[in-house]
């Protein structure tokens, strides 16, 4: 398991630009978790993965930006062997004037299956760009992408506020649950 974690109050220049390359042999498996909850002013995470037959890759990303922070997440997954599978999932929240880009590309070069998903909550003056991309080079490559960007639903806030939470507390509860 690989985990990138950034936290803090967002003051100063905190920059995180990791590049991860993964080469998976037949029958191998790997799970990666990336978690960044505020605290990093600028990040550009790039991940490249090459999977041979029956290899399994799971990537889970949880991201929250605020202030003027920027975050770029790039994933290039090549499913090169029969039975290779990949699941790349991102959940993110952009607050204040922050900006996020999620760019996930899955290429199926063999009978394989791949899935990428990006679910985001946008708040204030945030900016989110989701770029899910699929390429099939084999008739038996089964590839799926999903992307959704939206705001917190008013009825969710009202429900929590009727239980005694302030609007800010209700927003935090919703965000914390979403990023789990």
Features from the language model and the residues they span:
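Conserved beta-strand/loop scaffold segments within soluble protein domains that form the structured core
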Residues: 1-158, 162-165, 175-180
């Amino acid at each position: 398991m690989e985990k990138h974690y950034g936290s803090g109050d967002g003051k100063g220049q905190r920059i995180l630009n990791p590049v991860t390359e993964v080469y998976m042999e037949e029958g191998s498996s790997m799970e990666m978790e990336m978690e960044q909850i505020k605290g990093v002013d600028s990040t550009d995470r790039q991940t490249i993965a090459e999977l041979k037959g029956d290899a399994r890759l799971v990537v889970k990303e949880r991201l929250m930006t605020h202030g003027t922070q920027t975050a770029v997440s790039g994933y290039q997954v090549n499913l090169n062997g029969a039975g290779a599978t990949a699941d790349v999932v991102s959940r993110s929240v952009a607050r204040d004037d922050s900006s996020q880009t999620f760019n996930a590309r899955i290429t199926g070069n063999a009978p394989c299956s791949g899935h990428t998903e990006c679910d985001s909550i946008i708040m204030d003056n945030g900016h989110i760009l989701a770029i899910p991309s699929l390429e099939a080079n084999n008739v038996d490559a089964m590839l799926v992408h999903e992307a959704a960007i939206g705001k917190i639903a008013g009825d969710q806030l009202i429900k929590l506020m009727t239980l005694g939470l302030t609007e800010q507390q209700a927003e935090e509860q919703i965000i914390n649950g979403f990023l789990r």
